[in-house]
Design a protein with these regions (language model features):
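Non-heme di-metal
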Residues: 1-135
Length: 135
């Protein structure tokens, strides 16, 4: 319907990736791993409870195709918050996460720890398409 507005969103999404990479390289302040994990939990929780739900609602109301991606984002961000919580618990115990393999769904952003899933539980993408990250 509105291709130029769509392009704006696409360009902004890429800009956000650039910003995120920049923040990782040069954080505004040096914090402990515990603080960084808590900030990550807070950020992910904000995204799946406050930021994406109104976008999802509006896209659904307008029957816009973006509703699918917003739905994926809500679900994936909740998973991310849970993973950061697991990491926070481990660090509080003086440990690292025990898993060494991480699998990222290239469609919705879901992350699976340990073993490649058969299919993504959020978007149903085949597990063979997941991107593996190893320590």
């Amino acid at each position: 319907g509105l291709p130029n507005v769509a392009k704006l969103f696409e360009a902004t999404a890429q800009a956000e990736l650039i910003h995120a990479a920049g923040h990782l390289k040069a954080p505004d302040k040096i914090q402990s791993t515990l603080d960084n994990l808590q900030d990550a939990i807070d950020g992910e929780t904000h995204e799946f409870t406050e930021m994406y739900p109104p976008m999802l609602q509006e896209a659904t109301t307008e029957n816009h195709k973006a509703r699918v991606m917003f739905g994926f984002a809500v679900a994936a961000e909740e998973v991310h918050a849970g993973l950061y919580k697991k990491a926070l618990e481990a660090v509080r115990e003086g440990k690292d996460l025990e898993v060494t393999d991480f699998y990222l769904c290239p469609v919705c952003g879901y992350i699976e720890l340990g073993a490649r899933p058969e299919r993504c539980p959020i978007c149903n993408t085949k597990g063979e398409k997941f991107v593996q990250y190893q320590a």
